[in-house]
Curated annotation (Swiss-Prot):
This is Guanosine-5'-triphosphate,3'-diphosphate pyrophosphatase. The keyword Hydrolase applies. It comes from the Bacteria. GO terms for molecular function: guanosine-5'-triphosphate,3'-diphosphate diphosphatase activity. InterPro entries: ATPase_NBD (IPR043129), GppA/Ppx_hydrolase (IPR050273), Guo-5TP_3DP_PyrP (IPR023709), Ppx_GppA_C (IPR048950), Ppx_GppA_N (IPR003695), PyroPPase_GppA_Ppx (IPR030673). It catalyses: guanosine 3'-diphosphate 5'-triphosphate + H2O = guanosine 3',5'-bis(diphosphate) + phosphate + H(+). It is an enzyme of class 3 (hydrolase). Keywords: Hydrolase. Its EC number is 3.6.1.40. It comes from Photobacterium profundum (strain SS9). The keyword Signal does not apply. Pathway: Purine metabolism; ppGpp biosynthesis; ppGpp from GTP: step 2/2. Pfam families: Ppx-GppA, Ppx-GppA_III.
Amino acid sequence: MERNPISPLYAAIDLGSNSFHMWIVREVAGSVQTLAKIKRKVRLAAGLNSQNELSEEAMQRGWDCLSLFAERLQDIPAERVRIIGTAALRTAVNADIFLSKAKDILGSKVDVIPGEEEARIIYQGVAHTSGGSDKRLVVDIGGASTEVIIGEGFDASALTSLKIGCVTWLERYFKDRYLTAENFDAAIDAAKNAIEPIVEQYTQLGWETCVGASGTVQALQEIMLAQGMDEIITLSKLKRMQRQAMQYERLEDLDIEGLTLERALVFPSGLSILIAVFESLNIESMTLAGGALREGMVYEMMSKMRHHDVRERTLTSVQERFQLDTSHASAVTNTAMALLSRCDEEWQLEPQAQYLLHASVCLHEIGTSIEFKKSGEHAAYLINHIDLPGFTRAQKHLIAELLRRFREQLTSLPEQHALSAQNAARILRLLRLAVILCHRRDHNQQPPFSLSVAENKLVLTLPAAWLLANPLSHVELQQEATRQTDMGWPLVLEESE
């Protein structure tokens, strides 16, 4: 029986070569709300023998996992459930045995999709959850295959599925569990040989940004952040991770700061493949994608969710969900952008800084949905703990810290990796000024102003008559000038006739 016909449930199940995943969601305010996420390490690909036959033990691990999933599918109509099998099931010559029993357990057919179709769905998952509209290269390292895609917006122009994966490479090149240079070299060279046929095509097509959509990339980002690095993955950082891994003799001893026990087993093999991809395609840098296969499955079932700008869809959804005053947010945004335009020539902030200021202004009152007095603290907590498709982890963290400080007491921003410390402080200053200038919430009462800038010194000039007619705003601006100046960010308030 369906409890909520207005907001139906959807389920996406990914029978991966390393892990089985189930994701149950519903649509809320134009965005996807997660209701359940279940993951089990089945390592199906590890059960393939030299004749590509799945062992009884591996199949049983899979069936046991599906029995757990089945309980949660009972109340979701079959047309809103999609179950996909990937590389291990494509490869297994006896997959029909596994699939027949899987259908009996789940009550729905498992769709074993070709590699190119998997790549296409992965790209849709990335496109719906990652910010920016640049031409992008997407790399997803799975248990038994690696998908490499080039696309722009929601359209992919090149789709490839390579028969290299972190589980199969583990069993082939780290079978003895030794983390030696010889094992790493063999794994990297073999992956390069598999990638070589697509190098010319992908190099000619080109890309502007690169994102990784896999557990390997997520593990790398967790390690880098734990070790005080930013979230941008580069070849030099990958080599550094390889050197750290090789300090341990055996895989069972691997204890890199930031690497979870759950990810450790397939980390060296996944790392080897990623190094090969970077070197073969001359990738300069990579960031973590917001989603991949499961997200693509869900967004294709929810076709109405398609939006040309993922981040704008996210901001609109959060505003609706928390019933924020969008008219006021728009007025504060216009003021913040006007302030920023006065600083452009001197500060030359990157486009990302401008967009993070915009996002922060759009959401600056989110904390008041809980309580006004500590609204900054509540805002920071909410931003850190809700899904924001299109924004990276570092960007979410910075938005949270900006909103923690959007009014009243002013403290230094903590270390963050979304912007330079100087530029993050600069957009914080403009956010705070915009909020004060709009505090009457009457857009007709906003004053004409001018802002001049010399390095870090700001001079804000307002009409004397307006300051006289708005004494509270005058006091708040004077207090803000003192607070920013005390932080070493000079702010001078002047009057004009």
